[in-house]
């Protein structure tokens, strides 16, 4: 539960020394993680303030874009049926300072991270721009370069939320693969490792860790068996595609139909996109009613 509020709760979590992995699904810019729409509200007056704040912000944005403040105020008053006292202090320095603090409470900023001293070993930022290393500073860099035990971040340098599944083959990490080995299988141009690519979690004694350098299709076919973990099977399908295995399309369709594991079926969907034999169309029709929201979205 995000009590007492989202921002302070998350900052407390990333500071925990026993936290191995954090995965953020959020909006972002290089210097900010947008983690909540509104700060903590303890009373009904908080929502009254929020409504007025949003009206004032609308005026400020319009003025920055060259519009006349008075005409914008008149439009707002008319549209929402409010009185002028809701917004007439939009450019009052005291109100602007209060609104700035209110806005800051909705996101995690660079200085917030430095103060939190993150200890989470690995963080995945499924957000735009949080990993934009082209800037002088960015969220992902601040996690690993601040005091604390954070070692690696996976971040994006541009807009990617609609294009990327940040959980693809993540089970490889459970089996003891290094972060860099995992990212070699799933990386896209806009995603980056910031920190130590050799980092890995301790695997159990019965972990499965196939040789990523093996180029024999028969070797990888055995790992498509249901007796292996979901993402090892997904890795095997991925490697078979890379090795141009001739009978992969029917194997993908069969796996799609027989597996109830969402991430494995998502891997089948991704790979079948490369085949023009009718099987992709079959899974798309099934996918629009899939229990997994991301499969439904990709299918539509």
Label the model's feature ranges.
Residues 229-231, 260-264, 274-278, 282-300:
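Long, helix-rich interaction regions
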Residues 166-254, 258-270:
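Caspase-like cysteine protease fold
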Residues 41-54, 173-180:
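Acidic, Ser/Thr-rich peripheral helices and adjacent loops at domain boundaries
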Residues 7, 30-43, 132-136, 162-166:
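Extracytoplasmic/secreted cell-surface and envelope-processing proteins
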Residues 1-24, 29-40:
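Functional beta-strand-loop-alpha-helix junction segments that form "active/interaction loops"
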Residues 1-5, 52-54, 153-161, 183-187, ...:
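A generic structural motif
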């Amino acid at each position: 539960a995000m009590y007492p509020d989202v921002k302070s709760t998350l900052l407390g979590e990333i500071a925990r020394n026993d936290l191995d992995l954090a995965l953020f699904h959020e909006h972002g810019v290089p210097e900010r993680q947008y983690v909540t729409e509104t700060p903590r509200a303890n009373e009904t007056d908080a929502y009254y303030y929020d409504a007025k704040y949003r009206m004032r912000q609308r005026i400020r944005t319009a003025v920055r874009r060259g519009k006349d403040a008075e005409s914008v105020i008149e439009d707002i008053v008319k549209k929402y049926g409010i009185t002028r006292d809701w917004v007439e202090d939009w450019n009052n320095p005291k109100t602007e300072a209060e609104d700035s603090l209110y806005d800051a409470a909705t996101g995690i900023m660079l200085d917030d991270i430095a103060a939190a001293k993150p200890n989470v070993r690995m963080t995945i930022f499924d957000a735009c721009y949080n990993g934009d290393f082209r800037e002088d500073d960015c969220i992902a860099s601040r996690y690993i370069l601040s005091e604390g035990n954070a070692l690696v971040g996976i971040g994006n340098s541009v807009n990617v939320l609609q294009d990327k599944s940040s959980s693809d083959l993540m089970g490889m990490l459970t089996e003891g693969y290094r972060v860099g080995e995992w990212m070699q299988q799933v990386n896209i141009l806009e995603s980056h490792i910031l920190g130590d690519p050799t980092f890995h979690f301790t695997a159990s004694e019965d972990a499965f860790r196939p040789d990523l350098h093996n180029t024999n299709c028969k070797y990888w076919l055995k790992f498509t068996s249901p007796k292996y973990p979901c993402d090892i099977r997904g890795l095997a399908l991925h490697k078979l595609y890379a090795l141009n295995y001739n009978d992969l399309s029917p194997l993908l369709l069969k796996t799609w139909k027989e597996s109830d594991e969402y991430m494995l079926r998502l891997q089948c969907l991704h790979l079948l996109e490369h085949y023009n034999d009718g099987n992709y169309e079959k899974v798309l029709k099934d996918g629009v009613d899939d229990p997994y929201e991301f499969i439904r979205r990709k299918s539509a």
